[in-house]
Amino acid sequence: MPSLQDYHVPYPAAAPGQVRKVIYLPQQNPTVEQQHLRVQIIPGRHENCEDGRLYKLTGSVTEETLQGWGYSYYVVKLGDIYAAHRSSSDPARVTTFVALDENPVIAYNSKLPIVVYVPEGAELRYRVWTDDTSLVQSIQQQPEAPALPQPHLVPVTERQECPHELPRCGAPGEYVTQDCKTSMLSVEEVHRLSSSTPPLIPSAVRGSAHEAHAAPPLHSAELEERVCPVMEHLEVCPQNNGHEGREQPAEEASTLKRRSSSSSSSNPRHHSANEPSPSRPRLSSTEYWPHENSKTKRSPSATHKPRRSTDSAAIEEAGVGAPKKNRSSSSSASSKRKAEDNVYEKTMKNFWNRARSDSPRKASASSKKSGNGSKADP
Protein backbone atom coordinates (compact mmCIF):
# COMPACT_ATOMS: atom_id res chain seq x y z
CA MET A 1 0.00 0.00 0.00
CA PRO A 2 1.45 3.40 -0.95
CA SER A 3 2.11 6.18 1.57
CA LEU A 4 1.81 9.96 1.46
CA GLN A 5 5.59 10.35 1.34
CA ASP A 6 5.74 8.45 -1.99
CA TYR A 7 4.05 11.38 -3.76
CA HIS A 8 6.64 13.91 -2.44
CA VAL A 9 3.95 16.54 -1.83
CA PRO A 10 4.28 18.76 1.31
CA TYR A 11 0.73 18.46 2.75
CA PRO A 12 0.28 20.42 5.99
CA ALA A 13 0.20 18.59 9.27
CA ALA A 14 -3.07 18.15 11.17
CA ALA A 15 -4.12 20.95 13.50
CA PRO A 16 -4.75 20.24 17.19
CA GLY A 17 -8.07 18.39 17.61
CA GLN A 18 -7.97 17.08 14.02
CA VAL A 19 -6.79 13.92 12.27
CA ARG A 20 -5.50 13.60 8.70
CA LYS A 21 -7.18 10.91 6.60
CA VAL A 22 -5.81 9.82 3.17
CA ILE A 23 -7.75 7.90 0.45
CA TYR A 24 -5.77 6.03 -2.25
CA LEU A 25 -7.77 5.27 -5.39
CA PRO A 26 -7.00 2.33 -7.71
CA GLN A 27 -5.59 3.22 -11.12
CA GLN A 28 -8.03 3.14 -14.08
CA ASN A 29 -8.03 4.24 -17.68
CA PRO A 30 -7.48 8.05 -17.78
CA THR A 31 -10.44 8.66 -20.11
CA VAL A 32 -12.66 6.50 -17.93
CA GLU A 33 -11.52 8.31 -14.78
CA GLN A 34 -12.25 11.72 -16.25
CA GLN A 35 -15.59 10.96 -17.94
CA HIS A 36 -17.23 8.03 -16.17
CA LEU A 37 -16.07 7.89 -12.52
CA ARG A 38 -16.79 10.09 -9.48
CA VAL A 39 -15.91 9.90 -5.72
CA GLN A 40 -18.30 10.84 -2.90
CA ILE A 41 -16.79 11.80 0.52
CA ILE A 42 -18.97 10.71 3.50
CA PRO A 43 -17.60 11.95 6.87
CA GLY A 44 -19.41 11.07 10.14
CA ARG A 45 -19.13 9.56 13.61
CA HIS A 46 -20.66 6.82 15.75
CA GLU A 47 -23.54 7.85 18.01
CA ASN A 48 -25.79 6.01 20.47
CA CYS A 49 -29.31 5.80 19.06
CA GLU A 50 -31.30 3.85 21.69
CA ASP A 51 -34.73 4.87 20.39
CA GLY A 52 -34.00 3.29 16.99
CA ARG A 53 -34.34 6.52 15.12
CA LEU A 54 -32.04 7.67 12.29
CA TYR A 55 -30.00 10.80 12.84
CA LYS A 56 -27.69 13.08 10.90
CA LEU A 57 -24.89 15.49 11.81
CA THR A 58 -24.62 19.15 11.11
CA GLY A 59 -21.34 20.51 9.78
CA SER A 60 -19.47 21.43 6.63
CA VAL A 61 -16.75 20.28 4.19
CA THR A 62 -14.44 22.94 2.75
CA GLU A 63 -11.93 22.55 -0.09
CA GLU A 64 -8.52 24.25 0.24
CA THR A 65 -5.53 24.44 -2.17
CA LEU A 66 -1.90 23.76 -1.30
CA GLN A 67 0.09 26.90 -2.00
CA GLY A 68 2.82 26.51 -4.63
CA TRP A 69 1.57 23.07 -5.75
CA GLY A 70 -2.04 23.52 -6.74
CA TYR A 71 -3.21 20.31 -5.07
CA SER A 72 -6.49 20.22 -3.19
CA TYR A 73 -7.30 18.92 0.30
CA TYR A 74 -10.52 18.98 2.38
CA VAL A 75 -11.30 20.12 5.92
CA VAL A 76 -14.39 18.73 7.75
CA LYS A 77 -16.22 20.35 10.70
CA LEU A 78 -18.90 18.36 12.58
CA GLY A 79 -21.75 19.89 14.63
CA ASP A 80 -24.72 18.65 16.66
CA ILE A 81 -26.86 15.57 15.92
CA TYR A 82 -30.53 15.70 14.90
CA ALA A 83 -33.19 13.18 13.99
CA ALA A 84 -33.57 12.80 10.22
CA HIS A 85 -36.93 10.95 10.20
CA ARG A 86 -38.85 8.40 12.24
CA SER A 87 -38.01 5.32 10.16
CA SER A 88 -36.89 2.42 12.36
CA SER A 89 -33.30 1.24 12.44
CA ASP A 90 -31.69 -1.93 13.72
CA PRO A 91 -32.67 -2.08 17.45
CA ALA A 92 -29.82 -4.49 18.26
CA ARG A 93 -27.19 -2.01 17.07
CA VAL A 94 -27.69 0.96 19.33
CA THR A 95 -24.41 2.65 18.28
CA THR A 96 -24.63 3.47 14.58
CA PHE A 97 -22.70 5.56 12.06
CA VAL A 98 -24.29 8.93 11.59
CA ALA A 99 -23.18 10.66 8.35
CA LEU A 100 -22.79 14.32 7.70
CA ASP A 101 -25.73 16.05 6.12
CA GLU A 102 -23.47 17.35 3.32
CA ASN A 103 -21.64 14.70 1.22
CA PRO A 104 -19.60 16.32 -1.58
CA VAL A 105 -18.82 14.52 -4.86
CA ILE A 106 -15.36 15.14 -6.39
CA ALA A 107 -13.44 14.01 -9.48
CA TYR A 108 -11.73 10.65 -9.66
CA ASN A 109 -7.91 10.95 -9.94
CA SER A 110 -5.73 7.95 -9.18
CA LYS A 111 -2.47 9.90 -9.63
CA LEU A 112 -3.02 11.94 -6.44
CA PRO A 113 -4.35 10.92 -3.02
CA ILE A 114 -7.44 12.44 -1.42
CA VAL A 115 -6.37 14.17 1.82
CA VAL A 116 -9.16 15.02 4.34
CA TYR A 117 -8.78 16.63 7.79
CA VAL A 118 -11.53 15.49 10.20
CA PRO A 119 -12.09 16.07 13.95
CA GLU A 120 -10.83 13.54 16.47
CA GLY A 121 -13.17 10.62 16.96
CA ALA A 122 -14.73 11.06 13.49
CA GLU A 123 -14.77 8.50 10.71
CA LEU A 124 -14.32 9.03 6.97
CA ARG A 125 -16.01 6.91 4.33
CA TYR A 126 -16.20 7.29 0.57
CA ARG A 127 -18.17 5.84 -2.34
CA VAL A 128 -17.17 5.50 -6.02
CA TRP A 129 -19.88 6.21 -8.57
CA THR A 130 -19.81 5.03 -12.17
CA ASP A 131 -22.13 5.21 -15.18
CA ASP A 132 -23.36 2.48 -17.50
CA THR A 133 -20.59 2.88 -20.07
CA SER A 134 -17.78 2.20 -17.62
CA LEU A 135 -19.73 -0.71 -16.19
CA VAL A 136 -19.98 -2.30 -19.65
CA GLN A 137 -16.26 -1.80 -20.24
CA SER A 138 -15.39 -3.37 -16.91
CA ILE A 139 -17.51 -6.37 -17.74
CA GLN A 140 -15.80 -6.72 -21.12
CA GLN A 141 -12.34 -6.50 -19.51
CA GLN A 142 -13.08 -9.32 -17.09
CA PRO A 143 -11.05 -12.46 -17.77
CA GLU A 144 -12.85 -15.16 -19.62
CA ALA A 145 -13.99 -18.16 -17.69
CA PRO A 146 -11.75 -21.18 -18.05
CA ALA A 147 -12.92 -23.61 -20.65
CA LEU A 148 -14.55 -26.69 -19.29
CA PRO A 149 -12.67 -29.90 -19.85
CA GLN A 150 -14.08 -31.82 -22.76
CA PRO A 151 -15.47 -35.23 -21.91
CA HIS A 152 -13.50 -38.21 -22.96
CA LEU A 153 -14.93 -39.59 -26.17
CA VAL A 154 -15.02 -43.34 -26.40
CA PRO A 155 -14.21 -44.55 -29.93
CA VAL A 156 -17.11 -46.38 -31.49
CA THR A 157 -16.37 -49.40 -33.58
CA GLU A 158 -17.63 -49.11 -37.14
CA ARG A 159 -20.23 -51.56 -38.27
CA GLN A 160 -19.37 -53.88 -41.05
CA GLU A 161 -21.35 -53.19 -44.18
CA CYS A 162 -23.49 -55.97 -45.53
CA PRO A 163 -22.01 -57.65 -48.60
CA HIS A 164 -23.71 -56.93 -51.91
CA GLU A 165 -24.06 -60.62 -52.73
CA LEU A 166 -25.79 -62.58 -50.01
CA PRO A 167 -25.13 -66.30 -49.76
CA ARG A 168 -27.91 -68.32 -51.35
CA CYS A 169 -29.72 -70.93 -49.35
CA GLY A 170 -30.50 -74.33 -50.75
CA ALA A 171 -34.27 -74.49 -50.34
CA PRO A 172 -35.34 -71.27 -52.12
CA GLY A 173 -33.03 -72.00 -55.06
CA GLU A 174 -34.52 -75.44 -55.57
CA TYR A 175 -38.06 -74.04 -55.35
CA VAL A 176 -37.32 -71.37 -57.98
CA THR A 177 -35.76 -73.81 -60.41
CA GLN A 178 -38.69 -76.16 -60.00
CA ASP A 179 -41.14 -73.31 -60.68
CA CYS A 180 -39.28 -72.28 -63.84
CA LYS A 181 -39.31 -75.80 -65.26
CA THR A 182 -43.12 -75.98 -65.35
CA SER A 183 -44.39 -75.31 -68.88
CA MET A 184 -47.12 -72.78 -69.61
CA LEU A 185 -50.54 -73.93 -70.78
CA SER A 186 -51.44 -73.46 -74.43
CA VAL A 187 -54.56 -71.75 -75.72
CA GLU A 188 -56.24 -75.05 -76.60
CA GLU A 189 -55.75 -76.44 -73.11
CA VAL A 190 -57.14 -73.26 -71.59
CA HIS A 191 -60.16 -73.51 -73.90
CA ARG A 192 -60.67 -77.14 -72.97
CA LEU A 193 -60.45 -76.41 -69.27
CA SER A 194 -62.81 -73.46 -69.52
CA SER A 195 -65.38 -75.45 -71.54
CA SER A 196 -65.25 -78.33 -69.08
CA THR A 197 -65.92 -76.09 -66.06
CA PRO A 198 -69.65 -75.36 -65.55
CA PRO A 199 -70.88 -71.75 -65.23
CA LEU A 200 -71.05 -70.21 -61.79
CA ILE A 201 -74.36 -70.36 -59.94
CA PRO A 202 -75.39 -68.59 -56.73
CA SER A 203 -74.59 -71.68 -54.70
CA ALA A 204 -71.09 -71.70 -56.13
CA VAL A 205 -70.67 -68.01 -55.38
CA ARG A 206 -71.55 -68.64 -51.74
CA GLY A 207 -68.82 -71.25 -51.58
CA SER A 208 -65.32 -70.79 -50.28
CA ALA A 209 -62.81 -68.49 -51.95
CA HIS A 210 -60.72 -71.46 -52.96
CA GLU A 211 -63.55 -72.98 -55.00
CA ALA A 212 -64.41 -69.60 -56.56
CA HIS A 213 -60.86 -69.08 -57.83
CA ALA A 214 -60.39 -72.69 -58.97
CA ALA A 215 -61.41 -71.99 -62.58
CA PRO A 216 -58.42 -70.83 -64.69
CA PRO A 217 -58.69 -67.39 -66.37
CA LEU A 218 -59.50 -67.14 -70.07
CA HIS A 219 -56.92 -66.03 -72.59
CA SER A 220 -57.42 -62.78 -74.47
CA ALA A 221 -57.63 -64.54 -77.87
CA GLU A 222 -60.36 -66.85 -76.59
CA LEU A 223 -62.34 -63.92 -75.21
CA GLU A 224 -62.26 -62.21 -78.60
CA GLU A 225 -63.49 -65.39 -80.34
CA ARG A 226 -66.44 -65.60 -77.97
CA VAL A 227 -67.42 -61.94 -78.20
CA CYS A 228 -67.22 -61.52 -82.00
CA PRO A 229 -70.11 -63.90 -82.97
CA VAL A 230 -72.42 -62.07 -80.62
CA MET A 231 -71.55 -58.69 -82.12
CA GLU A 232 -72.23 -59.93 -85.66
CA HIS A 233 -76.00 -60.23 -84.97
CA LEU A 234 -76.25 -56.70 -83.56
CA GLU A 235 -76.20 -53.29 -85.18
CA VAL A 236 -75.62 -50.08 -83.27
CA CYS A 237 -78.01 -47.20 -83.87
CA PRO A 238 -76.37 -43.78 -84.25
CA GLN A 239 -76.71 -41.19 -81.52
CA ASN A 240 -79.56 -38.82 -82.39
CA ASN A 241 -81.25 -35.99 -80.45
CA GLY A 242 -78.94 -36.41 -77.46
CA HIS A 243 -79.94 -40.12 -76.84
CA GLU A 244 -77.34 -42.84 -76.49
CA GLY A 245 -77.08 -45.51 -79.17
CA ARG A 246 -79.03 -48.75 -78.76
CA GLU A 247 -78.44 -52.21 -80.18
CA GLN A 248 -81.11 -53.71 -82.45
CA PRO A 249 -81.27 -57.14 -84.00
CA ALA A 250 -80.67 -57.62 -87.72
CA GLU A 251 -84.32 -58.59 -88.36
CA GLU A 252 -85.64 -55.29 -86.97
CA ALA A 253 -83.07 -53.39 -89.06
CA SER A 254 -84.30 -55.12 -92.25
CA THR A 255 -87.95 -54.26 -91.48
CA LEU A 256 -86.96 -50.64 -90.87
CA LYS A 257 -85.20 -50.59 -94.25
CA ARG A 258 -88.36 -51.80 -96.03
CA ARG A 259 -90.58 -49.26 -94.26
CA SER A 260 -88.23 -46.39 -94.99
CA SER A 261 -87.97 -47.32 -98.69
CA SER A 262 -91.77 -47.62 -99.07
CA SER A 263 -92.42 -44.34 -97.26
CA SER A 264 -89.80 -42.50 -99.31
CA SER A 265 -91.29 -43.75 -102.62
CA SER A 266 -94.91 -42.93 -101.66
CA ASN A 267 -94.43 -39.57 -99.88
CA PRO A 268 -91.61 -37.47 -101.40
CA ARG A 269 -91.24 -34.94 -98.58
CA HIS A 270 -88.38 -32.49 -98.21
CA HIS A 271 -86.83 -32.39 -94.75
CA SER A 272 -83.62 -30.85 -93.57
CA ALA A 273 -80.90 -33.02 -92.12
CA ASN A 274 -80.88 -31.11 -88.80
CA GLU A 275 -84.69 -31.42 -88.15
CA PRO A 276 -85.59 -35.04 -87.35
CA SER A 277 -89.25 -36.06 -87.84
CA PRO A 278 -90.85 -37.52 -84.67
CA SER A 279 -93.00 -40.09 -86.57
CA ARG A 280 -90.15 -41.41 -88.71
CA PRO A 281 -88.40 -44.49 -87.22
CA ARG A 282 -84.68 -44.40 -86.49
CA LEU A 283 -82.37 -45.65 -89.18
CA SER A 284 -79.47 -47.97 -88.58
CA SER A 285 -75.85 -46.90 -89.01
CA THR A 286 -75.80 -48.23 -92.60
CA GLU A 287 -79.21 -46.72 -93.54
CA TYR A 288 -78.87 -43.25 -91.93
CA TRP A 289 -78.39 -41.53 -95.32
CA PRO A 290 -80.69 -42.95 -98.12
CA HIS A 291 -78.97 -44.14 -101.29
CA GLU A 292 -79.32 -41.83 -104.27
CA ASN A 293 -80.62 -43.25 -107.52
CA SER A 294 -79.03 -42.06 -110.71
CA LYS A 295 -82.40 -42.22 -112.53
CA THR A 296 -84.18 -39.99 -110.02
CA LYS A 297 -81.44 -37.35 -110.00
CA ARG A 298 -82.26 -34.14 -111.79
CA SER A 299 -79.84 -31.79 -113.33
CA PRO A 300 -79.58 -28.34 -111.75
CA SER A 301 -80.39 -26.74 -115.12
CA ALA A 302 -83.75 -28.49 -115.33
CA THR A 303 -84.86 -27.66 -111.81
CA HIS A 304 -83.54 -24.09 -111.61
CA LYS A 305 -84.73 -22.39 -114.82
CA PRO A 306 -85.13 -18.61 -114.73
CA ARG A 307 -88.63 -17.27 -115.20
CA ARG A 308 -89.70 -13.91 -116.59
CA SER A 309 -92.78 -13.43 -114.41
CA THR A 310 -93.02 -10.51 -111.98
CA ASP A 311 -93.54 -12.92 -109.04
CA SER A 312 -89.88 -14.04 -108.91
CA ALA A 313 -89.48 -12.76 -105.35
CA ALA A 314 -92.42 -14.82 -104.15
CA ILE A 315 -91.08 -17.90 -105.97
CA GLU A 316 -87.64 -17.50 -104.34
CA GLU A 317 -89.24 -17.19 -100.91
CA ALA A 318 -91.37 -20.28 -101.49
CA GLY A 319 -88.26 -22.32 -102.54
CA VAL A 320 -86.97 -23.81 -105.77
CA GLY A 321 -88.61 -27.21 -105.26
CA ALA A 322 -92.06 -25.81 -104.23
CA PRO A 323 -95.18 -27.24 -106.01
CA LYS A 324 -97.39 -25.34 -108.50
CA LYS A 325 -100.17 -24.75 -105.96
CA ASN A 326 -97.83 -22.82 -103.70
CA ARG A 327 -96.65 -20.72 -106.64
CA SER A 328 -100.20 -19.83 -107.70
CA SER A 329 -101.16 -18.90 -104.12
CA SER A 330 -98.12 -16.67 -103.78
CA SER A 331 -98.90 -14.92 -107.12
CA SER A 332 -102.55 -14.33 -106.08
CA ALA A 333 -101.43 -12.85 -102.74
CA SER A 334 -99.07 -10.45 -104.49
CA SER A 335 -101.81 -9.36 -106.93
CA LYS A 336 -104.17 -8.67 -103.99
CA ARG A 337 -101.53 -6.51 -102.32
CA LYS A 338 -101.05 -4.51 -105.50
CA ALA A 339 -104.81 -3.97 -105.86
CA GLU A 340 -105.05 -2.75 -102.27
CA ASP A 341 -102.17 -0.35 -102.87
CA ASN A 342 -103.91 1.06 -105.95
CA VAL A 343 -107.16 1.62 -104.03
CA TYR A 344 -105.26 3.42 -101.25
CA GLU A 345 -103.51 5.68 -103.75
CA LYS A 346 -106.82 6.57 -105.44
CA THR A 347 -108.49 7.51 -102.16
CA MET A 348 -105.55 9.70 -101.14
CA LYS A 349 -105.58 11.50 -104.52
CA ASN A 350 -109.30 12.21 -104.21
CA PHE A 351 -108.79 13.55 -100.69
CA TRP A 352 -106.09 16.02 -101.80
CA ASN A 353 -108.12 17.16 -104.78
CA ARG A 354 -111.11 17.95 -102.58
CA ALA A 355 -108.88 19.85 -100.14
CA ARG A 356 -107.44 21.99 -102.95
CA SER A 357 -110.84 22.71 -104.47
CA ASP A 358 -112.32 23.79 -101.09
CA SER A 359 -109.61 26.39 -100.27
CA PRO A 360 -110.54 29.14 -102.94
CA ARG A 361 -114.26 28.79 -102.17
CA LYS A 362 -113.62 29.76 -98.52
CA ALA A 363 -111.51 32.76 -99.58
CA SER A 364 -114.24 34.04 -101.99
CA ALA A 365 -116.92 33.61 -99.34
CA SER A 366 -114.97 35.71 -96.84
CA SER A 367 -114.47 38.51 -99.44
CA LYS A 368 -118.20 38.63 -100.21
CA LYS A 369 -119.03 38.98 -96.52
CA SER A 370 -116.58 41.89 -96.13
CA GLY A 371 -118.10 43.71 -99.24
CA ASN A 372 -121.60 43.42 -97.92
CA GLY A 373 -120.57 44.92 -94.62
CA SER A 374 -118.95 47.95 -96.25
CA LYS A 375 -122.06 48.72 -98.22
CA ALA A 376 -124.29 48.51 -95.18
CA ASP A 377 -122.20 51.01 -93.19
CA PRO A 378 -123.17 54.26 -95.15
From Swiss-Prot:
Protein name (database record)? Ecotin-like protein 3
The record's section on Gene3D superfamilies has:
Ecotin, Ecotin, trypsin inhibitor
Question: Which residue stretches does the UniProt record annotate as biased composition, category Polar residues?
Answer: 274-287
Residue spans of biased composition, Low complexity class:
362-378
Protein family (similarity comment): Belongs to the protease inhibitor I11 (ecotin) family.
Q: Where is the composition biased (Basic and acidic residues)?
A: 337-348
Segments for region (Disordered): 191-216, 238-378
> What Pfam families has UniProt attached to this entry?
Ecotin (PF03974)
Q: Which domain of life is it from?
A: Eukaryota
The GO molecular function terms of this record are:
serine-type endopeptidase inhibitor activity
